[in-house]
Every structure is written in structure tokens, then in C-alpha cells.
């Protein structure tokens, strides 16, 4: 009888990928990046172990949203003070906080809890085309579709 392979946390080999967000749709990019961060693209995927790779996203300020979402989509946050509910449109987020916009989309697709926090540490998002991770020799990742 064969047993299912379970990866060990210290035996996982991690790669570094660079993803260019220029002209990419926010949701489609986010789902694929979340899948890479979890390690679901590997045959050694184990649900309770962090088997994913590191992802660097560049050009976050040039992300694309379909339809009228730039004006209609609203991001809410609360200051934890009475009456402290703040809101921003997607257009404001893309112009002023493009890194936070992408991080929110991707982290929402990761598991909640200890494993999700550990996985999200492997995400690096940059608004421009430059990143400080050249020493890791990241591979360019071509998105499907």
C-alpha cells in the first residue's frame, strides 16, 4: 500500500519569481500569485506546510481593473475610534497606494491564521520597475492567459 507524500518544512526548495503587473488584471494576477505563494503549482504541495515560492511583483502602479471598478470599487478601513470608518476608491488606491492594493487582493486569497501569515511574508510588491532582490537571481514568471 502506498502512502501520500507529505513535504517537510525544512526540505522544501524555494525559488524566486518576478511578475510584471503592467497591463495585468488585478484578480487574475492575484489568483496566480496566491497559488505560487501557497505552492499549489508544485507536485509536492502539502496543505498544512508552507511549500510555496517567493514572488516579487513590479509595476504595481500599472495594474488594470476591468469595467467601471476604478470609480465604483471602494476599499474600507477602520481606525478603531468611534466614527472612524474611512473609504477610498480603487482609483485613489492605485494612484496613492498601489502596493497596498495588490497586497490586499493577494492576502485575501491566502489562508487565515498562522500559515497564511507565514506565506504572505514571501510576497514583495513594488510600485515601480525596480526591486532590491537581484542577489536572489529571480526568474521571470509568465502568467497563464
UniProtKB/Swiss-Prot annotation:
Disulfide bonds: none annotated. It holds the Pfam family Ribosomal_L13. The keyword Ribosomal protein applies. GO terms for molecular function: mRNA binding; structural constituent of ribosome. One of its GO terms (biological process) is negative regulation of translation. Part of the 50S ribosomal subunit. The keyword Ribosomal protein applies. This protein is one of the early assembly proteins of the 50S ribosomal subunit, although it is not seen to bind rRNA by itself. It is important during the early stages of 50S assembly. GO terms for cellular component: cytosolic large ribosomal subunit. PROSITE patterns: RIBOSOMAL_L13. It comes from Bacillus cereus (strain G9842). InterPro entries: Ribosomal_uL13, Ribosomal_uL13_bac-type, Ribosomal_uL13_CS, Ribosomal_uL13_sf. Belongs to the universal ribosomal protein uL13 family. This is Large ribosomal subunit protein uL13. Keywords: Ribonucleoprotein, Ribosomal protein. The gene is rplM. It comes from the Bacteria.
